[in-house]
Swiss-Prot record:
EC number(s) from the headed UniProt entry: 6.3.4.4
Species annotation: Coxiella burnetii (strain RSA 331 / Henzerling II)
Cofactor: Mg(2+)
One example of a Gene Ontology biological process annotation: 'de novo' AMP biosynthetic process
Record has Nucleus as a keyword: no
Protein name, entry field: Adenylosuccinate synthetase
Family: Belongs to the adenylosuccinate synthetase family.
Binding residue positions for GTP: 11-17, 39-41, 304, 330-332, 412-414
Length: 435
């Protein structure tokens, strides 16, 4: 069985924990888009691990972890991550494979990203400054350096020289930044080459072989659907396609081979950086939500904006991803709220609408229409049995299912792998559904 697991909001939904939990009986986990601009946090027996590029299956012995062609790969970030995991006794090089068609994220991409954000000032998009956007620009413009280029040093030197000269024109003459030295970039890549060369290969062919052996494969998305470059809250989006279609194009795996698509969503909503956020809470409730949920970026440390669950945007996410199931995370964050609110419509220019407008100027003016429900005001932290959950919490979950039309198959009640209620088996492995 082949399953896509992705975020349904603006990222930070808890994908890493869920992927890790489900990898017990899978052969491989695949990253198919994004870069090291988002982190997946795993907590196992109290020990925290943050992954930025390497798929979340790396903590399971024998699980292949594949970086697909849709990822933009920062060599220094990857090496740092490998060394951190090796220090914990995890044999990364035995489990990790990198698509030879994967584009590399290089120093001039980072320099351009930072220069552009500085130029925009208060109108900045709010990128992480890690060079993701410029790296994807080079990919689309067909001047990108790919992992396979590391296997041909002489050709690589000429490509680096041309690309650096091209980007230095912008850096030096438009942004008034110090130009970069192509030889230094090349020398650095040669050092990385020796460390990652054995892991470079044909990920698409490897996936094909696993499929023919009827192995279970998870395709792990980064960020969230509302950050999709085409279907998200443009221009306040990331530079890749974060929706289910990207799992095929970003890995070289045919779309008809996918069996299920699981969407990860928090029991509330968060967002990092600029952009419209209809249900955002800027009052004490929002601060309480952020504090209880420890809402700070795992990579950047930036505080996240918080708000009530948005049914309208979630319906759009279900539609564009063809979700077959929902995983609800961080339910325990709502434990102390006396009242819970669900946004069931928007009021835009005096008109009640049930679809989120793509026009961002209109979306920014939309106000949420709320349905109020009683809170449970008792701890759900660490629960593993649905029948032990407070009635009000179960009512909240039932109402979400009713409004969304998709079953909530898994509920996360805490950060650890064990803090989980499985209501419906994902693979064919034996899992006792609770409730």
């Amino acid at each position: 069985m082949n399953i896509v697991i992705l975020g349904t909001q603006w990222g930070d939904e808890g994908k890493g924990k869920i992927v890790d939990m489900l990898t017990e009986d899978v052969a491989a986990v695949v990253r198919f888009q994004g870069g090291h601009n988002a982190g997946h946090t795993l907590i196992i027996d109290g020990e925290k691990t943050i992954l930025r590029l390497i798929p979340s299956g790396i903590l399971r012995e024998g699980v292949l972890c594949l970086i697909g062609n849709g990822v933009v790969l920062s060599p220094p970030a990857l090496i740092e991550e490998i060394e951190e995991l090796n220090a914990k006794g995890i044999p990364v090089t035995e489990q990790l494979r990198i698509s030879s068609a994967c584009n590399l994220l290089l120093p001039y991409h980072v320099a351009l990203d930072k220069a552009r954000e500085a130029e925009l000032g208060t109108k900045a998009i709010g990128t992480t400054g890690r060079g993701i956007g410029p790296a994807y620009e080079d990919k689309v413009a067909r001047r990108g350096i790919r992992a396979m280029d590391l296997l041909h040093p002489d050709q690589l030197l000429e490509k680096i020289k041309k690309a650096t000269a091209y980007h230095n024109i912008q850096l030096e003459h438009y942004y008034h930044q110090t130009p970069l030295d192509y030889q230094s970039i090349y020398n650095q890549l040669m050092e990385f080459r020796e460390k990652i060369k054995p892991m470079i290969g044909d990920v698409s062919a490897l996936l094909g072989n696993l499929r023919r052996q009827n192995k279970h494969i998870i395709f792990e998305g980064a960020q969230g659907s509302l950050l999709d470059i085409d279907l998200g809250t443009y221009p306040y989006v990331t530079s890749s396609n974060t929706t289910a279609g990207s799992a095929a194009t970003g890995s070289g795996f045919g779309p008809l081979y996918f069996d299920r698509v699981l969407g990860i969503t928090k029991a509330y909503v968060t967002r990092v950086g600029a952009g419209p956020f209809p249900t955002e809470l800027t009052n004490e409730e929002g601060k309480k939500m952020a504090k209880r949920g420890n809402e700070f970026g795992s990579v950047t440390g930036r505080p996240r904006r918080c708000g009530w669950f948005d049914v309208i945007s979630m319906r759009r996410t279900i539609q564009i991803n063809s979700l077959t199931g929902i995983v609800l995370t961080k339910l325990d964050v709502l434990d102390e709220f006396a009242k819970i609110h669900l946004c069931t419509a928007y009021r835009c220019d005096g008109e009640v609408v049930n679809e989120p407008p793509f026009d961002q100027s209109l979306l920014e003016s939309c106000e949420p229409v709320y349905e109020e429900m009683p809170g449970w005001q008792t701890s759900t932290y660490g629960l593993t049995d649905y029948s032990e959950m407070p009635k009000e919490a179960r009512n909240y979950i039932s109402r979400l299912e009713e409004l969304l039309g998709v079953p909530i198959t898994i509920i996360s009640t805490g950060p650890d792998r064990k803090h989980t209620i499985v209501r419906q088996a994902v693979f064919n492995q034996v899992i006792t559904a609770k409730g």
